[in-house]
Amino acid sequence: MACALTDEISQRLGVQHFALEPARSATLCAALLAAGRYGALVAWRGREPLGFAGFSESVALYAEGAFATIQEFYVHPDWRSRGIGAALIAAATRLAQERGWTRLELCTPPLPQFQRSLDFYAREGFEVTGGRKMKWVPGS
């Protein structure tokens, strides 16, 4: 599903920002999950995954301790606006409380193409904190 997410972002923006390969992503996901460096909440219908929230824990002084970042969040287009995303956010906030995280953070893809995503997160209790997501890649 992470590949479907990055494909959708690239398609809607008209720019190829990602180059995920499904097999490599699945192997990496399994390794990160096994090492406890990544977590995932998955919404299922029988054996069919409908959506997921992938997260990692971090610590920061500004957050006053441990917190988590929802790194990837995706619901299959056929299942959007049916409560799947809200259920995933509810599960993530419960997990945050159980683990004593001081907050959950996430980034949205660029606006205006993903305004609907921003509106969804706002309805679920997230607030815009400003800034821009930036990256540095070795060798670039």
Role assignments for model-derived ranges:
Residues H76, A87-R103, E127:
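Conserved acyl-CoA
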Residues F73-R80:
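A short, internal acetyl-CoA/4′-phosphopantetheine-binding micro-motif in the GNAT/acyltransferase core
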Residues A40-V42, E48-E57, T69:
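Conserved beta-strand in the GNAT
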Residues A43, S81-A86, A96:
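Glycine-rich acyl-CoA binding loop
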Residues C3-C29:
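Conserved GNAT-fold acetyl-CoA-binding loop/helix
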Residues R80, R103-S117, W136-G139:
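Conserved beta-strand-loop-alpha-helix junction that forms the acyl-donor binding cleft
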Residues Y121-G131:
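Conserved acetyl-CoA-binding loop of GNAT-fold acetyltransferases
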